[in-house]
Amino acid sequence: MARVERSLLLLVPASAAYRVVADVQAYGEFLPGCDSVEVLQERTLEDGVSEVTARVTASARGLRQEFVTVNRCQPFERIQVQLQEGPFDRLDGCWTFKPVGDEGCRVELELEFIAKGLLMKTLSGALGSVSDRMVDAFAERIQSAS
């Protein structure tokens, strides 16, 4: 199993950072390689957590992949991501949003995955650089939205 961890320190409130990451529908506007997002289901659970199931179509290194994730969003604190179907045997992730001082926040991303198939296993070595570009794109979007 491979693991990716990234952390950002931003001069925006945690709630602003959370809103950008939770807005799955907008990913195609700013994430590199994200061709489209289709929200399949949205619901609010009894504990105040919202759950969004979405199909993402992404391209990288000439390979186009489609995957479905379920995102469980604890408002302004955490977003847990779990693969429902796609090119991985397993993909779990978690975004956390922690206030720092009066107007800043720390945003952390942890991903764990097991690639499926020989081609995906070969390409999985590039996931670190893909994650860096993705986190950078989120940081730019968060800062421009605030």
Predicted regions and their residues:
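Hydrophobic ligand-binding cavity/cleft-lining segments
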Residues: 1-46
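Hydrophobic-ligand binding "helix-grip"
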Residues: 28-29, 36, 41-43, 57-104, ...
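Generic recognition of short, well-ordered alpha-helical segments
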Residues: 22, 92, 121-122
